[in-house]
């Protein structure tokens, strides 16, 4: 996969070398994703938006038409940047992702969809955002997504891009040491035992720590019983923290079996009524 990131703060993603290649530090150069980049499995390229600003001050923003506070990032600068980044890309293969509080919520399902792409381009906005004509123009050449990572506002798109890139790249083949890890993720929709649920509690050695012991069931060696316990715990946690996910499962064919519904009812979250108890 090729990932291009356009930003006015390229150093946010680590030291940038020739052709926008990222060095072995920063969020793109560390951990398993950094190793995937070093192997060439992921081609990261980071570009300084100011490189396409024509004036001596490398201006990338201007006052908004219609008035109002703040500044808006200029269409001409962004247009030239996207033209240059896409110049050596195969026609129709790139997908543009623009983080924005007003965008579509970013989900695990969307991350899985992005992981099937061959080329992602991220546009890191700042100030009041990017002139809306940039996305409209880009849509004539590629799919364009405005994506929100949550109901809050950041100073710029760089942090959001880091979140999205990590969520996507860990789903690529060979990035994680154990591919099974993806199947039982929170929000996993790949048919694992935790599909549609938040992941439950996890434990490791020592068995006893500060007088707190690991649940005996996890030491039993009975994988069927362990799997059931893990699902029960996931159901309880999801009901408390994300009841909307339980409602979604309850409405889906085969989303919850009889045991699931009993576990939830015992925990005070009956799902056979329109509104669950809390």
Model-found features: residue ranges?
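Hydrophobic/aromatic beta-strand patches that form the interior of the parallel beta-sheet core
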Residues: 4-6, 45-47, 97, 120-122, ...
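Intrinsically disordered, low-complexity terminal tails and inter-domain linkers enriched
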Residues: 16-25, 90-91, 273-277
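SAM-dependent methyltransferases
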Residues: 1, 196-197, 202-278
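S-adenosyl-L-methionine/SAH cofactor-binding core of RNA-modifying enzymes
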Residues: 73-131, 173
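A cross-family acyltransferase "interaction/gating" segment
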Residues: 177-208
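Structured adenosyl-cofactor binding patch, chiefly the S-adenosyl-L-methionine
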Residues: 130, 134-189
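Short His-Asn-centered micro-motif
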Residues: 9, 99-101, 123-125, 150, ...
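N-terminal nucleotide/polyanion-binding subdomain common to many enzyme families
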Residues: 1-85, 224-247
């Amino acid at each position: 996969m090729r990932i291009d990131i356009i930003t006015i703060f390229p150093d946010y993603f680590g030291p940038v070398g020739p052709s926008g290649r990222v060095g072995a530090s920063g969020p793109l150069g560390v951990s398993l994703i950094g190793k995937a980049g070093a192997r060439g499995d992921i081609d990261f390229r980071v570009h300084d938006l100011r490189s396409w600003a024509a004036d001596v001050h490398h201006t990338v923003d201007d006052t908004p038409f219609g008035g109002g506070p703040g500044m808006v990032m200029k269409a001409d600068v962004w247009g030239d940047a996207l033209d240059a980044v896409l110049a050596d890309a195969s026609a129709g293969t790139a997908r543009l992702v623009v983080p924005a509080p007003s965008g579509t919520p970013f989900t695990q399902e969307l991350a899985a969809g992005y992981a099937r792409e061959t080329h992602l381009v991220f546009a890191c906005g700042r100030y009041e955002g990017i002139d809306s004509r940039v996305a409209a123009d880009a849509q004539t050449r590629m799919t364009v997504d405005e994506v929100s990572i949550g109901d809050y506002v950041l100073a710029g798109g760089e942090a959001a891009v880091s979140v999205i890139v990590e969520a996507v790249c860990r789903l690529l083949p060979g990035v994680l040491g154990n591919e099974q890890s993806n199947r039982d993720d929170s929000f996993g929709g790949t048919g694992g035992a935790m599909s549609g649920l938040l992941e439950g509690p996890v434990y490791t050695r020592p068995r006893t720590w500060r007088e707190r012991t690991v649940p005996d069931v996890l030491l039993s060696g009975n994988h069927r019983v362990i799997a059931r316990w893990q699902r029960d715990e996931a159901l309880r946690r999801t009901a408390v923290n994300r009841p909307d996910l339980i409602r979604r499962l309850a409405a889906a064919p085969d989303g919850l079996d009889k045991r699931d519904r009993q576990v939830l009812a015992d925990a005070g979250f009956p799902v056979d009524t329109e509104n669950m108890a809390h």
